[in-house]
Design a protein with these regions (language model features):
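Juxtamembrane/interface alpha-helical elements of multi-pass membrane proteins
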Residues: 66-200
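Membrane-helix interfacial "entry" motifs
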Residues: 11, 58-62, 117-121, 125, ...
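Alpha-helical transmembrane segments and their helix-start/interface "positive-inside/aromatic belt" motifs
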Residues: 22-23, 59-74, 254-262
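Structural signal for the C-terminal ends of transmembrane alpha-helices
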Residues: 53-59, 147
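Hydrophobic alpha-helical transmembrane segments of multi-pass inner membrane proteins, especially
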Residues: 44-50, 58, 65
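Short helix-capping/hinge motifs at transmembrane helix termini and TM-loop junctions
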Residues: 37, 56-57, 84-85
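Transmembrane alpha-helix interface motif
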Residues: 1-39, 47-54, 161-164, 181-290
Length: 290
């Protein structure tokens, strides 16, 4: 399932913000969020992320596929990594907690002993992990939908990246919708020839063979497109001299305010958690019985 990150002007408040300020603020918020496991602090970032998402004026139809992928990733990480294996939990959760469900059984033939203990602490940690991932996802997910693809290059260049790296990032973001379009065109063409991907049956090898008519044309077309871009850049002697950009970006007062708020938030997070050790995993006393 490919996601088309299509941009269209919406006239939202978020689109007026300098794209450099948006990237800087999102990155700083990312580093601030990962400092905490306390739901009280994570709710603050989650509310900020939701407020930004609402301000973008994005609709469910536009972001439905992106949300589907995010929800699948979040569910997989929370259910498998936290509730079942506990490999992603912090030390407090790994210790014995207040059990809600206990399953202990031995696997026949091999004799493996399976122990599954679902505790209040694990459930609360799963909620914290979900808020953490969703907050980070919302801060970054809205960028491709609300940022003009023509200014990606100058945005990364304005953030201090070299011309080559800035242009590479620009091409990478432009390539996603192109790949989606090629995939859709190829799928429609193969369906016109009687290809039915929905009826994929059999084992792993049979399923791989079934998707070959889609993967091979899309991959070959992507390689040829990449070669065309490289040849065009070589013919224009890209990289020999400093690049000039058509678009120009200029910070405004609210851009500095957003960056300043993000910096202050990160500094506060660093001081609160690593220095004062506040914001670690926390379970409210009212949900623990007796």
């Amino acid at each position: 399932m490919l996601v088309s990150l299509s941009y269209r002007p919406r006239g939202s408040i978020i689109e007026r913000i300098d794209p450099r300020a948006r990237w800087i603020a999102s990155i700083l918020m990312l580093f601030a969020i990962v400092q905490f496991w306390d739901i009280r602090f994570l709710l603050f970032f989650f509310i900020l992320a939701v407020a930004q998402y609402i301000a973008t004026r994005l609709t469910w139809e536009e972001t439905r596929r992106a949300w589907t992928i995010i929800i699948i990733i979040v569910a997989s990480m929370v259910i498998i990594n936290t509730l079942i294996t506990s490999s992603g939990t912090v030390g407090q959760v790994m210790q014995a907690g207040h059990a809600i469900l206990q399953l202990h059984f031995r696997v026949p033939l091999v004799g493996w002993m399976i122990r599954f203990d679902l505790t209040i602490e694990r459930l609360w940690f799963a909620l914290a992990q979900m808020l953490r991932i969703l907050s980070i996802a919302m801060f970054f997910m809205v960028i491709p939908f609300t940022m003009d693809p023509r200014i990606y290059g100058i945005t990364f260049r304005g953030m201090g990246l070299p011309d080559r790296l800035a242009f590479t990032m620009d091409l990478a973001f432009r390539f996603i919708p192109t790949l989606t379009r090629d995939f859709s065109v190829t799928l429609d063409a193969q369906r016109a020839r009687g290809y039915e991907i929905e009826r994929t049956k059999g084992g792993l090898i049979a399923q791989v063979r079934k998707v070959v008519p889609l993967v091979v044309p899309v991959t070959m077309n992507s390689i040829l497109t990449g070669e065309d871009v490289v040849n065009a850049m070589d013919l224009r002697c890209f990289g020999l001299h400093a690049r000039t950009w058509i678009q120009t970006l200029q910070y405004r007062w609210y851009d500095f305010a957003i960056i300043g708020f993000s910096v202050a938030t990160l500094v506060a997070a660093i001081v609160i958690q690593p220095v004062f050790h506040i914001g670690g995993f926390w379970v409210p006393a009212w949900i623990i019985p007796g």
